[in-house]
Amino acid sequence: QGLASHFVYGYGKGGKESVSHQNYPQVIKHTPRMTAMANIALFRLFNRDLFGNFNELYRTITRTAGPVVLHFHVLHSYWLNLKSVVRFCEKVKNHKPDVTLVWTLHDHWSVTGRCAFTDGCEGWKTGCQKCPTLNNYPPVKIDRAHQLVAGKRQLFREMLALGCQFISPSQHVADAFNSLYGPGRCRIINNGIDMATEAILADLPPVRETQGKPKIAVVAHDLRYDGKTNQQLVREMMALGDKIELHTFGKFSPFTAGNVVNHGFETDKRKLMSALNQMDALVFSSRVDNYPLILCEALSIGVPVIATHSDAAREVLQKSGGKTVSEEEVLQLVQLSKPEIAQAIFGTTLAEFSQRSRAAYSGQQMLEEYVNFYQNL
């Protein structure tokens, strides 16, 4: 799009470079392995990342000719100390006033004392008095959220005072942010499929109807985590026996039965999308997502999504005319054919649903919105 950019990330698996680091130009791995390890170890006691800053980027940014946009995304997850980031932004703005700060919020971390995902908890509305779970990401041994929440929110107010513009892919995260920091403080640009994935999807032939029993997909990074994959619901689907064929994609599947096919974790996006393309539906039961791209990707290749009630799933499905359902309804819907599922969830034919979804989740639309946003800063 003609905009020069650099991408700075914390670390990849094991504190090393990301596996895709060499695939892109102008990429910087930022956080030393020891910093990440120290943060991981100490976060469980302190409920915040103690180490990590952007200070070594100061000269690069302030010596760049012309206006600069610093666009932040996920700043938690053991690579940066929030207070250090805010102080860095103050220093940069004082030295180079034509730096603009932008922050895309991919979860609820900006409104809570600790958690990135609320998992139905609304304690943040009353100052995180007592955390109902210590396991919600990022997990801890001791709950200090109530002690930290006021100071953390003050740092976000300081970012707003520096002129930082906040964006979220989802309405429900933007609403939560605006309820604390003021109406209109966070605007919405929905996630879209990245251009490389969109090219893969364009090559996949549409599968109008599969042969045999319904093939149902469940996708998660770690299939053991109940927040992402409702374990009881999957077991109830398994209990349907030869009425369905259940396909899991992800690590550590605890599901074994005669009607289950465990594909493991697929790092090759083309292979994953090709496999999903053969499915009659994707069942989504996560309670801890914001605007999940796996839904956008499945819908874009014409695979109906059967999702249990959550703000995230509701918002994504509504964009293509779909709805969420109860767990009881899931067990009925997974026994239907692909066209019948499309009709039940999206109220239209499979062909019309596919066409509608391909347009709704286009990465090109997201890209154009961001470029327009940058150009109007």
What residue ranges belong to the model's regions?
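Carbohydrate-associated surface elements
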Residues: 172, 192
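Membrane-proximal helix-turn-helix segments that form the acceptor-binding/catalytic region
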Residues: 124-166
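Short hydrophobic beta-strand element within catalytic cores of glycosyltransferases
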Residues: 284, 304-307, 314
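Short alpha-helical segment that forms part of, or immediately flanks, the ligand-binding pocket
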Residues: 273, 295-300, 311-315
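Nucleotide-activated donor-binding/catalytic signature segment of Leloir-type glycosyltransferases, i.e.
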Residues: 250-273
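Conserved catalytic-core segment of nucleotide-activated headgroup transferases in glycan assembly
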Residues: 209-251
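A charged, aromatic-enriched C-terminal amphipathic alpha-helix characteristic of glycosyltransferases
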Residues: 204, 339, 343-376
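Aromatic "clamp/platform" in nucleotide-sugar-dependent glycosyltransferases that forms part
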Residues: 287
